[in-house]
Amino acid sequence: MRRLTLLPALAIVLPPLGAQRTAPERTDAARTSTHAEVLAFLDSLVARGAGIRVGTLGTSPQGRSIPYVVAARPMVSGPAEAKRSGKPVVYIQANIHAGEVEGKEALLQVLRELTVGDLRSLLDSVIVLAVPIYNADGNEAFGPATRNRPGQNGPDVVGLRPNGQGFDLNRDYIKQDAPETRASLAFITAWDPDAWMDLHTTNGSYHGYALTWSPGLNPNRTPANAWVQDTVLEQVRARLRREGVATYPYGNFMDQTPDSLAKGWITYESGPRFGSNLMGMSRLSILSEAYSNDPFATRIASTRAFVVATLRWLAEHPAEVRAHVAATIAARPDSVLVRSAFAPPRQDTVIAEISLAAGQGSGGFARRQRTGEFRPVVMPVIDRFVGTRAEAIPTAYVLEAQWSDVVELLRRQGVVVERLGAAWTGPVAAFRLDSVNVGRQFEGHRLVSVAGSWGEARPDSLPAGTFLIPTDQRLGMVAAFVLEPASEDGYTTWNYFDRALRPRAMHPVRRLDRLPDVPRHLVP
C-alpha cells in the first residue's frame, strides 16, 4: 500500500513577493526561526497594518519575552469585548517543546494569512489568540537535531525540549513550577477562550498519517470535550482527507515488529499535568502532533492545514461552540473521577509503515529502519480512559490559613477562593490517611500517592481566615480533582501537602456539605 498522496494543499504556502516570510520559507526549509526572527516577523505584520495586537505573555527564566498575538476583525479591546462578539475565541500555542519546530512556523504562516492574506474572512467569524514561541529559552538552545531531536526529519539544527529551568512545560500544568506556565494560566483565566490548541511533533511510531490529534483525555468528560472527541475532530479529519491530508487519533503501536502490529495502538496519559488534558476539563481542547518522520516542509504544511481546517470548522459552527461551552460552564457534576485506566479498546484499521529492527527494540517509541511500505492493519485502538475511583464533590473544600501556597496554585488555575471573615462551627469531613507512598523523582518532584478515605462529617471549628473553595463555580470540578487527596495528579501528587502527610493522620484538605453562614471574602 502507498501512503495517501499529499495534494498541492500540503505544499508550503508561499507569501506574495515582498511580503513577510518565515525562516523556512526564506531557506527552503533548511532552518527554523530564532526568537529574534519570530519577534521581527510579528513586528513586520504590525508595521504592515495587519490589524493584530502583539503583547507579552510573560518572561522566560532566562529573560526572554514570550509574545502573544490577538487577531480579530474588528480588533477587540480585551476579553470582555471578545465574549460580547459572539465569535469563538481560540487559543493556539506552539513550541512548548522547542525542538518540535513546525508548529511555530505554521502558526506564523496562519497569522499572516489571517491578517494580510487569503484567510482574512475567517476573522469575521473567529478570534485567534496565538502564542507561537511558548518555550523561548528552549528554542534558543540550538544544537544538532541528531542530539536534540533524534529521529526527526529536519531541520538539522533545533532547540531543546525543556525550558530554561530544565522542566518539561507540558508536564507543568498542575505543579506550575515554570514562569511560562504561570503566565499562560493567567492569560487563559483572563481571556477564558472557548477552544485551546497545542501544536507538537510526534516522538514515536512509524505510521501512515501526516498528523495525529487528540482531545483532552481526562475521563471527567465535559460537554465541550466530549463534543470535540466525538464530532469536531472527526469532521475536521474528514475535511482534511478530502484535501489529501491523512490524520488519525494520536497514539503509538504497542509493538512495531511487522508481525506484531496487530497488538494495538495506544494513546498517552490522562493526567492534567498535560495542558490539553487540563484544558479539556473546562473547554474545547485539541492536541496536534505532526509526523516526525515527514520532512520539515511537509510537517509545517500538515500543521498549517490542520489549524486552518479546525479554525474554519469552529468559525462555521459558532452557535454549537457557544452551546457546548455554556453547557460545560453550567455543569455541576456530583462526583469527580480521581483515578483512571484505559477504556476497553475499539477495533479499527490503522495505517502502519513497516519498519525493521535497528538496535532499539520494537516498542512504540523505538527508532527503527524505514521501508517506505505502508500497510493497513486491523487492531485494538485504545484512545479513551474510564474512571476507577470517584469521589463525591462537596459544597466546598477548606484549607487552613497556612496553605497559602496551595491557594496560589488554585488562583492561577482560575479557581475562585474565599476566606472566612469570622469563626464558624459546623460539620466538617476529614480524609484519614492509611498510607503514604513516595515514588520516583520526576520533574523536580518525588511523586506521592496516598491511600485512605473520607470519614463522616463531625462538628468542628474553623477560625477566621480559613480558606474556602466553593465547588459551585466555573472550575469546580478542576478544583475537586486537584484537591482530592486520592487524586492521581493533584496537589498531593506534587508534594504541596508533604509536611502534613503521615499514616493515620488527617489530610489538610477537608470538606463541607454546606457553606458557612458567616461573612466570606474573595481572595484576589
Labelled PLM ranges:
Residues 1-4, 17-524:
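Structured catalytic-domain cores with a bias toward divalent-metal coordination
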